[in-house]
From Swiss-Prot:
Family listed: Belongs to the chaperonin (HSP60) family.
Binding-site list for ATP: T29, L30, G31, P32, D86, G87, T88, T89, T90, G413, N479, A480, A481, D495
Coiled coil: none
Function: Together with its co-chaperonin GroES, plays an essential role in assisting protein folding. The GroEL-GroES system forms a nano-cage that allows encapsulation of the non-native substrate proteins and provides a physical environment optimized to promote and accelerate protein folding.
Full protein name: Chaperonin GroEL 2
Keyword Metal-binding: no
Pfam family, one: Cpn60_TCP1
Organism from which the protein derives: Prochlorococcus marinus subsp. pastoris (strain CCMP1986 / NIES-2087 / MED4)
Subunit architecture: Forms a cylinder of 14 subunits composed of two heptameric rings stacked back-to-back. Interacts with the co-chaperonin GroES.
Cellular location(s): Cytoplasm
Keywords: ATP-binding, Chaperone, Cytoplasm, Isomerase, Nucleotide-binding
Main location: cytoplasm
SUPFAM superfamilies attached to this UniProt entry: GroEL apical domain-like (SSF52029), GroEL equatorial domain-like (SSF48592)
Gene (UniProt): groEL2
Amino acid sequence: MAKRIIYNEQARRALERGIDILAESVAVTLGPKGRNVVLEKKFGAPQIINDGVTIAKEIELEDHIENTGVALIRQAASKTNDAAGDGTTTATVLAHAMVKAGLRNVAAGANAITLKKGIDKATEFLVGKIEENSKPISDSTAIAQCGTIAAGNDEEVGEMIANAMDKVGKEGVISLEEGKSMTTELEVTEGMRFDKGYISPYFATDTERMEAVLDEPYILLTDKKIALVQDLVPVLEQIAKTGKPLVIIAEDIEKEALATLVVNRLRGVLNVAAVKAPGFGDRRKAMLEDMAVLTNGQLITEDAGLKLENATLEMLGTGRRITINKETTTIVAEGNEKAVTARCDQIKKQMDETDSSYDKEKLQERLAKLAGGVAVIKVGAATETEMKDKKLRLEDAINATKAAVEEGIVPGGGTTLAHLAPILKEWADKALSGEELIGANIVEASLTSPLMRIAENAGSNGAVIAENVKSKPFNDGFNAATGDYVDMSAAGIVDPAKVTRSGLQNAASIAGMVLTTECIVADLPEKKDAAPAGAPGMGGDFDY
């Protein structure tokens, strides 16, 4: 296919146009008074949404070159979402501000490579400062505050996540389900999560989120490699009759057996998903036994004289719901408390008897996974559109609170970055010179952009607010919900340090890449053939 090649300033300007379109669409959602965006869907009702990364994923432009700019800035949002689970809009706004300021300097003759070095050095300095100013999370009030801000100022959501963390622990599993009523409820049930995802992406039932969600599945647990599909046929036939889904957790599944499962899944013969068992050697077997206890099934192992080809439905475990993504598997089980408690007591006994600190640590991990359970938040709403929006906000809030537990919290609402701007300027003036200093100044100028956008979305003058905040103590910022200047930590307006850090790093990375772009190679738009002329008497003269 013929290609279109664009050089220098023209290439960078084309990218900039795409970046402008995406940044503007996403930035309207920032802050407590951010607006919603409506996404038109080919099928079903339109989606009303307030989530930066979801909006970014939907935007595709007709112009291939501009679309490349969209894809670049979308990457900043996606990477921030992968690392911290929130802060995608902030990352987009920051990247946009850095690109705009940087392109002005490149157009004026600055060397893009030296600018990028300055941007990287400034980012490294800021990451250290964010770490310095972060405070560890100490109580459930701070957790609730974090969740509230991430969910778009929904206090009920913040409280619910804090309660969930109290019940399952800070490392515990919090899962989301679509509820059957209008209210959002919290329930704690038996369950566990382990760090292995699906073997093949073809098992995903939700292709947008790349997740496999199976309700009330049978669970086949085995510690052997499944090489031949013939071993599975008897049990697959029994399950096909019940019409229920199946999850296979095995040491491994070889190509032939895997291909057969995938084909059956794609043809709709059997709703199945396969996962590799976690751990190695004896630990793997012990974890599979834990899962068997949890799901009220049996581990099919030759040590116990059980063979895969002789497996029956009675040997399989059952669960309420299993959610599998590319990295983790979450099992939500229920109604098996006695057996789980007995198994936990057995693990505690083993911990008392062992002298090895390594074994103790691994047993402790197993105990935490088994005893912690799963907090299930059932999302309730009046309409499906509201349900989807609520679910995305809850997901952001859960991710934000987990990030806060990991790396602590900093003053929110764009305050931290705005206060770091003069600190960065002071350091850069001493430590850098020439075009590297200009690169650091580009970062410094962009640091107030999230705060300015939050203020503008609330109907205030962003530039004035940003200057006022910079002159105040580090903890003081602008509360866009009330229009006052307050102590952000005391007012409960906090952001996880990890979210602020990830957003800044990803924005700087994308800005550096755009500034150092000198040439774009893209597909030429295809010429569409003219439509054939209509037959006589078949004119296009319609009244609508």
